[in-house]
Amino acid sequence: MTEKSNIIKDYTYFLSKRGKLKEASPIRSLFQYSSLPGMISLGGGLPNASTFPFKSINIELKDGSKLEIEGSDLEEAFQYSPTPGLPRLQKALKDLQIRQHNLCPPDEAGKEWNLIISNGSQESLANAFEVLIDDNDSIITENPTYSGTLSILKPLSLNICGIETDRYGMIPEKLQRLLSEWDHSKFKFPRVIYLIPCGQNPSGTTMNHQRKLDIYSICSKYNLLIIEDDPYYYLQFESSENADDDDGASCSSLNLGKSLLSMDVDGRVLRFDSLSKILSSGLRIGFVTGNKQLLEKINFHQQSTTLHSSGLSQAVVLSLLNKWGVEKWNQHISFIQRFYLEKRNQMIDSIDKHLKGLVEFNIPSAGMFIWFKLPVEDSKTLIFKNAVEKKILLVPGISFSTDSTKPSQFVRASYSTASKEQIDEAIKRFADLLNEELKK
């Protein structure tokens, strides 16, 4: 918690020109009344569900149990639905956020918040930037940062202020200096800061509790809206390093670090979650949680673009969550954590074996990535040409740089999908490549 609370009551200041103009779709706004008892709808242009050729969907899980979606549940999945998501799934995800981030009930007076389901968190981010950022605005990010976000931001001709990081993420002193010495005659003062606090992509850094408090305090002081993009939140390893290998172990309390949302006293955090890393990336289910006023604008934008996330994907997730309950969900998260911890350790072993003394890196405590600093001035040609010739795929640091005109010594390696043997062979090939480069 910060010493002083600067509670936000009016979010107009944070909206882009387009965001301020966003209005509800007249037809979509009627959806909320369609389920009222006795309501006869002649308003919506919904296709008649009796014409759909699907009778039921059956999915077998890896533990042998089954999900069956049929009847009214299947009809709901295949029909147009409210933009924020299927109501029962939206409630289940709100319950998850309350449980995991210690949130108040969503309708508590003065603290009203909401949750909107989207086609993956990438869509949520794009929607948020649409209603928050104007062309030629300033925005603060970590440097390096997620390439997918840069792909959204760079075409807007923004002043992207990349703040240096250390092993715990964005350095507060660097952020404080940037804001306190801002030249208002050159650039618009930023309203938004974008952060990836856990298992940062690409650097693998994770903010500890004090770092989050320090960053939050500065954002409160300078009235910045925080975009907390946290797809690797459930891939934190510290709670798994001493866990038993029993995949049936009870995990009633996941030992995960406090999120920025959980410490938000001002109402300045928009949190973005994803099920891609923990259930399935192909389901394309993400969700954004935050102040009701801001989410209303995001909802209006989504009404005019994709309408809503896939009803079928939502129905599958809802059926799974209902079958699992809290305990089984926690067990699955614990399994995911142990799985990626083992993959990380496999890569660390191969680095110690083949790359010792050749690269610099920090051991990640969350996520899927290791960020190497190489003994070369620019990794781009080395990776795009030489590494490809040796049949190893890595990503050069320039792909994640807020300033792509400057060379980068860094490379991102992912340990998520390759086997132990493939990881070892790839790291060996990479070491051979570096040794050859250093001999030139």
Swiss-Prot record:
Catalytic reaction list: an aromatic L-alpha-amino acid + 2-oxoglutarate = an aromatic oxo-acid + L-glutamate
Cellular localisation: Cytoplasm
GO molecular function, one term: aromatic-amino-acid transaminase activity
Keywords attached to this entry: Aminotransferase, Cytoplasm, Pyridoxal phosphate, Transferase
Cross-referenced InterPro entries: Aminotransferase_I/II_large (IPR004839), Class-I_PLP-dep_aminotransf (IPR050859), PyrdxlP-dep_Trfase (IPR015424), PyrdxlP-dep_Trfase_major (IPR015421)
EC numbers for this chain: 2.6.1.57
Residues found modified as N6-(pyridoxal phosphate)lysine: 277
Keyword Repeat: no
Pfam families on file: Aminotran_1_2
Source organism, top-level taxon: Eukaryota
Cysteine-cysteine disulfides: none
GO CC list: cytoplasm
Cofactors required: pyridoxal 5'-phosphate
Biological process according to GO: alpha-amino acid metabolic process; biosynthetic process
Family membership noted in the UniProt record: Belongs to the class-I pyridoxal-phosphate-dependent aminotransferase family.
General function of this protein: Has aromatic amino acid transaminase activity.
Protein name (record): Aromatic amino acid aminotransferase DDB_G0287711
Species this protein is from: Dictyostelium discoideum
Organism ancestry: Eukaryota, Amoebozoa, Evosea, Eumycetozoa, Dictyostelia
